[in-house]
Design a protein with these regions (language model features):
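N-terminal secretory signal peptides that target proteins for export/translocation
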Residues: 1-2
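Conserved, structured core segments of small domains
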Residues: 23-244
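Bacterial N-terminal signal peptides
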Residues: 5-17
């Protein structure tokens, strides 16, 4: 539950959170978002050693998911600095030990940056229900991968944390715009990043790269320079995003 003493900057940033369904209006929860990037020992080469690390990385993902700690995961397309992400359940403890069990992180091939992501509940729930179902031959359904645009909203060149009337108006316009995106099906999940860092929020969107880029850049808060979007293509298992 959100504390009433939250600062204006954080309370305003919660306008990023778009609900999966307006008639439900679910309360937000505090996920732990782990952004995976190239680590200090990352190399582009693939060999028996890197294959072993990758196999251990995937096995650890399965362990964390089966333990109920991991509710979403998946790689980013391409071969840039950002490699993928983890989303951990709100009530998970000992994240450090979970991440230490990942050979890719322990070896320095990947680095994980943790942020608190305030977003609607239900992430990964449909996937877990589907995996729990058993087919007639006693096997769980195979995973199907789907892709979304992962839009990270960073502080823009004109970001202002002061609660001025102009800022309040811009935050309202931003919220109204994201609600419009949600209503027409382009925005499927979203939430604010807690704290005062550079990353302020994340939008998960449907559509091709050009369509998503236009939608992100048409955000009044982006046009005004409050936010600067960075768009990645994210692969994840079908059912991770509620309704998708």
């Amino acid at each position: 539950m959100l504390r009433p003493a939250l600062s204006f900057a954080f309370a305003a940033s919660l306008a990023l959170a778009a609900h999966a369904r307006a008639d439900d209006a679910p309360a937000s929860v505090r996920y732990q978002l782990g952004l995976l990037s190239r680590g200090p020992t990352w190399t582009p080469e693939k060999n028996a050693h890197t294959d072993s690390i990758q196999a251990g990385h995937m096995a650890n993902i399965v362990r964390m998911a089966e333990a109920g700690a991991l509710v979403a995961a998946g790689p980013f397309a391409g071969d840039g600095q950002w490699q993928g992400l983890f989303v951990f359940a709100p009530d998970v403890d000992s994240l450090e030990s979970l991440l230490a069990g990942d050979p890719a992180i322990a070896s320095g091939r990947l680095s994980c940056t943790l942020r608190t992501w305030v977003a609607p509940p239900g992430l990964g729930e449909q996937y877990r229900q589907r995996k729990a179902a058993v087919t007639a031959d006693g096997r769980s359904p195979r995973d199907s991968m789907v892709t979304f645009a992962w839009v990270m909203l960073h502080r823009g060149r004109k970001y202002d944390s002061r609660p001025t009337p102009a800022v309040e108006k811009l935050v309202r316009q931003h919220f109204e715009y994201t609600e419009k995106l949600r209503a027409d099906g382009r925005l499927v999940f979203a939430g604010a990043i807690e704290g005062t860092g550079d990353l302020r929020g994340v939008l998960v969107m449907q559509g091709d790269s050009a369509t998503v880029a236009r939608a992100a850049n048409d955000d009044p808060a982006v046009r005004a320079g409050r936010f600067a979007p960075a768009i990645l293509r994210w692969w994840t298992a079908w059912g991770t995003i509620p309704g998708h």
